[in-house]
Amino acid sequence: MRLGTTCLHTLLWLTLVLSAAAADATPEPLAHFAGADFQGGAKDLYGTAYEGEQVNTVYAEPTGPHSAMQLKFPVKRVPAGPLFVHLKARDDDAPRQCKIALLLNGQALFEGTNEFKPGSFTTRKFAIPDGALKEGENTLVIACREKNGRAGQPPWFQVAACTIAPAQYILRRDLHKDFWVKLPAEVRPFPEPLPPGKAPGFKFRGTKGWAWTPEQYLAEIPWLAKFKMNFLMNCYLSMFDLENHPNWGAKEANRWWEDLPEAKKKSYEQVVRECQKHGILFCFGMNPNIASKRMVNDNAPESVDLLWKHYAWMQGLGVKWFNISLDDITEGINASSQAKVANEIFRRLRAKDSEAQLILCPTFYSGDGTGEKQKPYLETLARELDRDIYLFWTGDAVVGKVTRKATDTFRSICGHRLFLWDNYPVNDNRPTMHLGPVLDRDLDICEVIDGYMGNPHCKQNEINRIPLATCADYAWNPADYDPARSIGQAIVHVADTPAQREVLRDLVEAYPGMLVYTSYRGTGFNAVQDQFDRIIGAPYSRQAAMAYIEHLQKLSDRLKQQFPDHYQPEKQTLDNDIQSLKNKFAVKY
């Protein structure tokens, strides 16, 4: 049966939209490429897509330019230590493997009969001799050395991926380009136990809330312990009078100078006790200057006293960790004044408990600290803020990568120990969810940062456990972190039955999160809306758009069936998106 153009486009979009189906230490690669990145070969004859991989293929020598593929890539600095070419490839289905050659800058890394399997992709590594890799431009060639054959017929050799990396590197799927979740056949301990004598990557590992209620904190404490986390900080919005002023930005809810209601204090005292019961360090925090009609005055002792009373209350409960946040403010951005307030609160805390710790969230809390406004501000904190006070830092940007280079630069300027405030999987109370694994955090930043703290969803704290579990996995053992493995284990650890795990897998794939997209969308990014907009923006897409809506509707029905008493805000988010897509569909078609 011949398929019409419309059906072909529909199938292509359905494939794009609906396809779904023990970690070792893995250093960062020097370079990574898809097979399709190689020039030459037979990709101009037969395309580059095969079994979800971007491939290139070489045929026997008589095929001329189709018998070899080459890749040119730059190297700024050749690292010390042995390096290897890691290939993900497959052989043809002929009776024997074909002969190939692998050359780097003209020097042979391998020549002879390849040992890759026919029919399925496998990986092998080839040692790079000393001196073969050079600074500047390098050329890697993969050639078929068979003397007889023609294009389109065996013998042939097909490459899906190529990486230059140390021996222990493992070729893994690039989740930025191809995100889907494979549920593991085995439920493993999670995070995996560390080898004897090895300490966790980050000493302190946890999350904060996001305008959470006491009930939300209490619900998450056992999960933090389950995932080997040991730190929980209240969101300063939780200390606002949200019960009477739900619009926290209207300068009525932040009443830091007033006593907290007794009922609220009792609720948070229970949160502290539950943390202590589960081995979780509770960190108490406030932000007196955000959306505030009355900012704290460093020159008025009575003003500092009004702020101090809240910290004194918590210290009386046995709390040892405290936070003053001065992020996202528009007034009072004076590093000297901020340091003066923080130093005074810290002095009072240490006077009562020599083990008390304070973390200041500075107004400039992201980037490498070299900006025109950031650097003098941070240099003032370096001089005037007590050296024992930690600083929160969100990474290279408010949302995005966290690199060792930016960490070292920021730390050298601010002059203080750092605690990573990782802005993932936070949605800032916007109608979306970010459910994929945490990505793009350098594996060695734990060497210079003591603590890791995730930032969560607002209302959807139950589904937040899935991405938070991957954060816990990363923070526990960064060197062995595999996001594809981690997200699968996270799902099977929060759901009991195969049907429950499958529906959560599909929900995660629908809302993979802002970090999966390499452009690093903001916290309000909605993958469902974005996917649908791309579908209806393509030609011949009406059937695909209908299928996508139907898929999401079935997902909603399954979620309600499998979890009748859970994930209520999550269900509402999904249902609202479905209705929005239906409205867009009606307008377009």
Regions found by a protein language model. Name each.
Residues W210-A211, N230, N254, E258, ...:
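Catalytic-core regions of glycoside hydrolase
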